[in-house]
């Protein structure tokens, strides 16, 4: 079994995440290529597409949201993701029974499924949904997260298109997006296949970390995806991968890239050293679920960035090598111009 080095895994991940070179893609194919973007903070998805897509414009994403070609919804790990409409139905079916929602929450959500589907045809706030549940169905609930996640999944409630705009409204509203419910296994086959195409080669623990699925629920999906390629990492752990997925050379050059808050590149593996050294991990991913905006130098997270008075400010973890200083400045200037 071939052993892949850390740098080989790094280059493979960056290639699949469209971070070796920007590609000329429209929004929907780009989202499907990278298995969606984490989207708790809507502007992050715009920066995430800008750093991956050649010529990306904000209007392109806003148009895709308005046309419901792109959907912002609770999916993997119970977090908000921006995905294509096609992937929304399959991803939602795959993770709805992932085990992280208490059975009683799912049962309660199923009881009001038909009613919430009808009620959700018009955009509603969370407060409006819970008031309606009390008034119309006598369900007095404290608004716990488990029930709210279950309600959105069982009722197919997604963030209304305007909640994903660059300038978000103050009150998030939710609306029904129709999709055909798919059996768990074919949905998980699709989900795991998307993950490997976007983040592989990967261990089973990596797939579980990103998807929120238990390893025992991942195994049948891997069986259905056979034949798969198998490798080992430098610690001897088995990696699985799709047969024709790219594996760039270790000496493949990597341009400087700026990643937004919550970017899945730093979140989608159990072992995140393929993109971020352990010594910097707590600086990037810390309390309250915050994931900072970062920049990559030679393919690895080298520091943080923020916008201050209209300027992009970089905070490297260590002094940048001389050869990388100008490329970092140039990419920061490009991002600054785009944000303006």
Over which residues does each language-model region extend?
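Long, low-complexity intrinsically disordered regions
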Residues: 1-272, 277-340
